[in-house]
A protein has these predicted regions:
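Flexible glycine-rich, low-complexity coil/linker segments exposed to the extracellular/periplasmic environment
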Residues: 63-83, 195-247
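Extracellular/periplasmic, surface-exposed regions of secreted and cell-surface proteins
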Residues: 1-203
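Intrinsically disordered low-complexity regions specifically enriched for long asparagine
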Residues: 173, 229, 252-256
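Conserved C-terminal beta-signal and adjacent last beta-strands/turns
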Residues: 167, 247-257
Length: 257
């Protein structure tokens, strides 16, 4: 999937933990805090999932037949069918995680918290501007970097009332997602489309594939047509009037079981 110069990758990882509750100085707290552990990890992984085979190679295909030689003989033409990218390299994700796990009140209550930062570099995407020579075929490219960071919390309680056992558990997670770099040759990349109209975009400073479009302002009482904000006061709706309409990626999620 990659050219020979970038075919191999090295993706290290390391993790460690410290069970503080097993230390001698912690003994006075064990009646309340049954177990307390700190965790930390860092690692990288590589991905080529977005690439098909030989994406770095320009493919040739048989074209039309043309009368280019004497004697009414025809010659078959050959032309590029796809444009390869010989600078492709691994998409790399690097994640740091810091966490704490605790059991309290003889194990009846459990609590955990994690803080994570995940940075994806050299994100592999397609949909870049096609070559005019070979028509609408696009080339994959290591187009940008993405940052994800947030917190994860979980709190639970379990106990018995006579022969009846019960447990309650809740969780909360936050996430900030942002494109932190985009190849200078690109302004934004199109994502999902509907009836050939782009709905989502990949753009620096915004969440991954955020919704970009016109701001609805109401209904024209005379015609019944929808109206939209003319943000640049040009008198017409243009691409410059489109704005950030939000993201499909939630800022936080939660659950109770």
């Amino acid at each position: 999937k990659l050219p020979a110069t970038n075919r191999w990758g090295y993706f290290p990882a390391v993790s460690g933990g410290w069970t503080i509750s097993e230390e001698k100085f912690f003994e006075p707290l064990r009646d309340v805090v049954t177990s307390l552990k700190l965790r930390a990890s860092w690692g990288q992984n590589g991905s080529l999932a977005a690439l098909s085979g030989y994406a770095y190679s320009t493919d040739m295909a048989q074209g039309g037949i043309y009368p280019l030689v004497p004697g009414n003989n025809y010659t078959t033409s050959v032309s590029p069918s796809s444009m390869g990218n010989d600078k492709l390299k691994w998409e790399t994700s690097e994640q740091t995680d810091l966490g704490i796990d605790a059991l309290l009140f003889a194990g009846r209550m459990n609590f955990s918290m994690d803080y994570f930062v995940k940075k994806t570099k050299d994100l592999l995407v397609s949909g870049t501007t096609p070559s005019l020579v070979i028509g609408g075929t696009t080339s994959p490219i290591n187009a940008g970097n993405v940052s994800n960071k947030g917190f994860e919390f979980e709190l639970g309680w379990r106990d018995n009332i006579g022969d009846f056992s019960y447990s309650v558990r809740g969780n909360l997670a936050t996430l900030k997602n942002e494109v932190t770099y985009l190849d200078p040759s690109l302004t934004r990349l199109q994502g999902t489309t509907f009836m050939n109209v782009p709905l989502t975009y990949f753009e620096k400073g915004y969440p991954v594939y955020y919704f970009r479009g016109y701001q609805f302002t109401g209904i024209d009482p005379k015609t019944g047509d929808p109206t939209f904000a003319d943000l640049n006061d040009s008198g017409d709706l243009t691409d410059d009037d489109k704005m950030d309409l939000g993201s499909a990626i939630p800022d936080f999620t939660y659950g109770i079981t």
